[in-house]
Amino acid sequence: MCETSNCSSNNGSVESINSDCATVGCDQNKRDDARTLGRDICDEKSVAAASIKSSDFIKHETNFRKNHPSDHRKSWVLPLFHVPTNEPGVMWTGNFRRTPVMTFSQSCILGKCDAAEKLGRCYNMSYRLVRMESKLIRNILSAHGFQESANHLGKFNLLWTGGHLRPTQLRILSDFHKINHFPRSYEITRKDRLAKNVHRMQRLKGLHQFDILPPSFILPEEFQELCSAYAQDKVPYIVKPMASSRGRGIFLISHPEEIPCDEPVVVSRYISNPFLLDGFKFDVRIYAAVTSYDPLVLYIYEEGLVRFATVRYQPGFKHLRSQCMHLTNYSVNKKNFEFVHNDDANVEDYGNKWSLGALLRYLRSEGADVTGLMLRIEDVIVKSFLSVLSPILATCNLFPACQSKCFELYGFDIIVDDNFRPWLLE
């Protein structure tokens, strides 16, 4: 979400939304109407005096009752603020609902939406993409009237970056800026940092409270602990680079000695009893958006993706080298000739990619406890954020303005075992 703010037509600079008249649809007539409405509410016979006070750009009218001195306890403060308009694409939030926030609609991507585009252009909204390229992000912003800014002096409303900002950049952010990363959010996105944070919470709160990850070890420093665990269970383990994505560099092992020692990796116990659909392994991608870490405010999207392997699952050590059996990543399985594409957006339960809704409908038809499963998945996601809350919040406190300027979208990969228990993969 991007806060809409007043803009200068001369130089294109954007003023703070906290300025006296920077809210959407604010004009003098509406403020006069608000004052008139406030006075009409009061009984004119009981009003002896009225004084106008200004505090944080919000005007208040304090009414005193001259004829009833004993009723001073009934005196009240009537906030007189800019009257919110019902302008399409604008949602009013904050104290007294005086902060306008621009909302985005997915329908604007599918077809031209003149109202949304006009709104963005009216307020001279702009964006910058840094260290990344995304056709989807460009299309969404363009459909809502955002113009790409080539200016490097901070004259933009939204900065979408592929990395994190430096401390010097965080300190110069203005009120109208929105950034798509929180400082130090790699505490949850890097596999090694996530494992360390979850282990810390397991020590503090108990293993049963934060048993959301398969047992994981960070190598080379925890190699002996891995060997001890392997001696007890004798099960396959899965090796992952610390900061990779799309299934790159992932492989399974039958013994710790098979792990190369040339680079740091995260080794996790392989979930060898996955819940299968028609004999195929799958995982679920769930998206969550965080708008604040103090307090923690997160939104879990009700829809998601289900990604299937392209080779039927067979347990044991014999088939550990078959990536298309054990890994569900699209980037891995799309190379297999068995991969089935779905070219019909209206069909959600066909091919190697389903929607989460289609999966839940299928499970419900089979008599599964879908509600319980989704509650457990939600619990895993919430506890993941609680595990990283302390280090991220400590960094955010060094840059207080980040709390109102940053947001972040996260993707959670969840696998379900044959006991209908969800596990966080990354």
What are these regions (language model features)?
Residues 84, 88-236, 243-245, 255:
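Conserved N-proximal alpha/beta basic substrate-recognition cap immediately N-terminal to
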Residues 215, 225, 233-234, 238, ...:
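Catalytic core of tubulin tyrosine ligase-like
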Residues 17-20, 194, 335:
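Compositionally biased, intrinsically disordered low-complexity segments
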Residues 61-91, 149, 199-203, 208-229, ...:
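Solvent-exposed, charged interface segments at domain starts and junctions
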Residues 73-85, 128-144, 165, 171-175, ...:
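Charged, low-complexity, helix/coiled-coil-prone segments
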Residues 1-118, 124, 181:
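Cytosolic, low-complexity regulatory segments enriched in Ser/Pro/Gly with interspersed Lys/Arg
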